[in-house]
Amino acid sequence: MLSGWSVLKGGNMKYWDKALLSLFMCVSTLSIAATHAVAMEGMQMTKEAREIIAHPKGTKESRGVISLQDYIVEEQAMYDWLFKNHPIFTKYGGKTVGKLVVKDRGEEWIEEGRGNDFSKASKRSGGEGFSSMMYRVARNSTLQYPNKFIGPEKCGECHPAQYETWSRSRHATTIRFPGEHPEVNNKLNDPVFDKDTASILPQGITPDVVYCTVGHIRTKFGFFDAWLLRGTYHVEGGLLKNGTGQIVAGGNQWQRTWALNLSPEVAKKIKKWVPDFPVTLEEYGDNGGYVRGLASYAAKYKKSMSFQASTSYCEVCHPWKFDFKNESEFYAALGNAKELQKHTISKGVSCEECHGAGGHLEGGSGLLISNCERCHQRFSYSPDLMRNNPLNAGKPDLALSSKFKSMGPGCGSEGSQTYFTAHYEKGMRCATCHDPHDVTGNVTGEKGIKGVSYNSEQGYLSSLYSKPKLKKECTDCHKEQAYIQSKADTHSKNSCASCHMPFMMSCENFYAIQFQDQAGFDTQRRAHIWKIDVDPARKSLVAGSTSKDPRDGKDWHFERNEEGRNFVDLMWACARTTWADKDQAEAKGCHSPVVSELKETLHFKDQKQVYNEVMGWQTPVKDKFTQVKVGIQGLYSLLEVKKLAPSDKTRVYELIEKAQDTVDLIEKDGSWGMHGFKYTKQRLDAAVEYINEAQRIMKKSL
């Protein structure tokens, strides 16, 4: 071997150098190819999905019906395709700044919300069944071909009124193609507000490689790329369509609150009150990005990103359907945004998502239902609620809470919040109050916001608020409360929802600004709980026992009162900070230390301060209420033993009835002056005088 080497070396040194260089290049090329192959081959679905795929409990073919596990099995082909064909692998060689973390239906539909733990606590299937905590799965997914969808325009032929109201609702536009964004003049790569804030699409992502955006300017915008992969990344130093630059985890989701409302000046104001509140980009940490207003959602900035097909998460509640005849046509179109858009037969929460493919038409699926729970009853199982309440033993359903996004109740959890309220127990459901065809109402767009283009035909698209049209108002049922509130002065312009349905829900999982004890600041949607808990310390939202630090976001859940129901604590009811609540804006910011226009002494920075203020109203009312009740009881006792002239007796009874009317009104109202302090006190003062006059008549007749 050595002699041969020597001969070659001595015989033709120049030739041998070239040979070595060629050999080195071949080895390098093989190494790179091997690296790419490993990157692709190393990608696999989650252990939950793999376990179900490997050990199915029967099959769709054997049962004749599709069940939860079959939805997970059918997604395998989608992930196999993505692992081979997404540009992350074909153009970038699997190299990303930040780790790829696969998320699929197995994890989202089985494990998320502690589904496996709930199954073990359940008696169903001997504790070995499946439990989809977050979703009531749609009957049809985009992976099933052919489907019977005909599209909302076809439904509108026979249901024109319903179509028109639906078409101008946010349900209709939750999914939009590039070119359908009049509120920003379709400039998806330009900063929306100031030049130092984010654009709707992140760096390196151009409209031609985007299938759709998700969301509205009121809250957030995300995107799905042309391969129907969730946009959890951006591209630095190049463009996705060219395969240039580098894929970077996070910095992917446009956030209205951060981009518009949380200016550095506002952030500094909050930081004086909340020392850990972030001001600089660096202080937003994993949740931040490269520019103000573009957060890392389903990602940690430059550390990790979810590799997640549309089929496993967002598409459940932000759906679309294609008219492809078979799977081959579908997979042939993936990667071509225009082709996917051309074959989209419905998008958004359209008619057939609730009423079934084809609706009631001959050949359709025949479903004539409303299916709000599919998207608005996201649960999460809480071991803490099971342990902490003896009444819950053996009843895992009573230990359910809502799906939380870190420390805040997530979007789509309205129904799971309502589930543990007196309203739900009495039979109230979503459609009791809401018209599912007209969920947005007659919303007026913003005309004076820099960067927002007002369009009169689609005004709601440029609106920063949401005021849904309601079939039934609070006052239709709560007449005593409505009557007293109509007499109020201090809170006369407040709606019921202002206090009883505070904006405390997170759409964005913007955990960097979630400070729940201070009732802020990642707050885009109304809570659906209603019951205000008057307590100096008890909190609506609490960390789980597994949390080493409350800010780690582990197992946060709704606390329960003595009746086992959810409640709104005083800080959230009176002093929350949100920029999404039209009612709060019209009420001069209520008592928020950040946005309130009231005098400084009415800016409440902790719950004890709110409680003391409430006691200042309720205590004198309760004292006088007790005085009136005792007085009435005393008069009835005297009437049993004293004889009065008929006219005096009649007058005493009249006075007692007047006092009792006030007692009944105050008792049914239940706010002890909070709905209208002065009027409540005036009624009680009058009731005291009725008692006094009745007592004088009794004494005169002795």
From Swiss-Prot:
The keyword Lipid metabolism does not apply. Heme c 5 binds at residues 430, 433-434, 528. GO terms for biological process: anaerobic respiration; hydrogen sulfide biosynthetic process; protein homotrimerization. GO terms for cellular component: periplasmic space. It catalyses: [protein]-disulfide + hydrogen sulfide + 2 A + 3 H2O = [protein]-dithiol + sulfite + 2 AH2 + H(+). Cu(+) binds at residues 411, 507. Disruption phenotype: Loss of growth based on sulfite respiration. Induction: Repressed by fumarate and nitrate. Up-regulated by sulfite, but only in the absence of fumarate and nitrate (at protein level). Substrate binds at residues 220, 297, 378. Heme c 2 binds at residues 314, 317-318. Heme c 6 binds at residues 423, 474, 477-478. One of its GO terms (molecular function) is identical protein binding. Its cofactor is Cu(+); heme c. Gene3D superfamilies: Butyryl-CoA Dehydrogenase, subunit A, domain 3 (1.20.140.10), Cytochrome C3 (3.90.10.10), Flavocytochrome C3, Chain A (1.10.1130.10). Pathway: Sulfur metabolism; sulfite reduction. Heme c 3 binds at residues 351, 354-355, 437. Keywords: Copper, Electron transport, Heme, Iron, Metal-binding, Oxidoreductase, Periplasm, Signal, Sulfate respiration, Transport. Homotrimer. Respiratory sulfite reductase that catalyzes the reduction of sulfite to sulfide in a single step, consuming six electrons in the process. Required for sulfite respiration under anaerobic growth conditions. Has only marginal activity with nitrite. This is Dissimilatory sulfite reductase MccA. It comes from Wolinella succinogenes (strain ATCC 29543 / DSM 1740 / CCUG 13145 / JCM 31913 / LMG 7466 / NCTC 11488 / FDC 602W) (Vibrio succinogenes).
